Amino acid sequence: MKNALLLVLPVALLAQPEFPRPNKDAVMSMEDYNPKSGLTVEEHPVKRAKYPLIDVHNHQPGEMNKAALDKLVKDMDGLNLQVMVNLSGGYGDRLKKTVDNMKGNYPKRFVIFANLNFEDMEAPDYADTVAKQLEQDIKNGAQGLKFFKNFGMDLRIKSGDRIKIDDPRFDKAFEICAKYKVPVLIHTAEPRQFFQPWDKDNERWLELKQFPNRYRPPDKYPTWETLMGELYSRIGRHPKTTFINAHLGWLGGDLGQLSKLLDKYPNMNAEVAAVLAELGRQPRTARAFFTKYQDRVLFGKDIWETSEYFTYFRVFETGDEYFDYYRKRHAFWKMYGMELPDEVLKKLYYKNGLRIIPGIDASQFPN
């Protein structure tokens, strides 16, 4: 028996898998390096929001057929997403068709924001024309106005001159929003790092490598600081107009500066679409910010991918530690839960949206 055991052991040793050995000269790309965490802690994945949601930042094709709308609403139900704000409403006939289709089929579940017509901006009567169209769009069911990032960054008139965010030809349109008490959700610029040198010190190096067209060199674009200066000039010019600063104004990584701006502009709010990665790496600072400004921050997601909402819920609702974000190019770091108090969570998820966006049926939400 002892001899048999001695014979088996060498065979067993020979059967062991052979692993690569460490090599100080080995090279691996940033994309390939994806280590599995050796940390074992409690995990509390969340696939459905604790309270009904109003997602104030989404984009959907307004002409989708009934079957596609039914599928969309079913997916929303799974997330506890009660109201989706479609920011891609357009203007004129397109806006009316989008409202008639989406709200006609599901009156309580969708909100449509209008967009402006940027054609013929050189025309002497453009300011009046665009304001009148917006007024008609609101009468046709638009519940807000959305500006995309091209406004200010690369929108130009025929002469080639850049249209600035605080260009006075748009003043009347912003005042129309004040008149009808509908908010303006405005997306200005992009992450600050897209405007900075693409080098080893740039925290968005990987994203710019994968998407070089997102880089904003100074010889082709205004600086990030210039664009933000124009944005806050615009917000300050219209104190009776309610603004929602998209993507936390790209200040998710500098909540101290965002705090100063919220203090300075009482008509400004902010939403969290596409900046969760910044919040999840500073949970204590973010929790304090969300608590202090609990009446000023709204929930938004931007890209419609249901599984990505789970990470938002987990960051906002749990105290989990060191878990993955869903897109490496945004965050090669781990997330930590903010564990927001229930009252703060309710305001983020739906109460602020109910207060700021007119016409949402409040009976769909708890008190």
Question: How would you name each of these model-derived features?
Answer:
Residues 54-56, 85-88, 113-115, 146, ...:
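Active-site neighborhood of phospho(di)ester-bond hydrolases with catalytic His/Asp-centered motifs
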Residues 19-29, 41, 95-214, 266:
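Active-site gating/metal-coordination segments in enzymes
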Residues 39-70, 74, 350:
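Mature N-terminal segment immediately following signal peptide/propeptide cleavage
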Residues 216-234, 238-367:
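H/E-rich (His + Asp/Glu) clusters that bind or coordinate divalent metals
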Residues 53-59, 71-93, 110-117, 143-144, ...:
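Divalent metal-dependent hydrolysis catalytic cores, especially in the metallo-beta-lactamase
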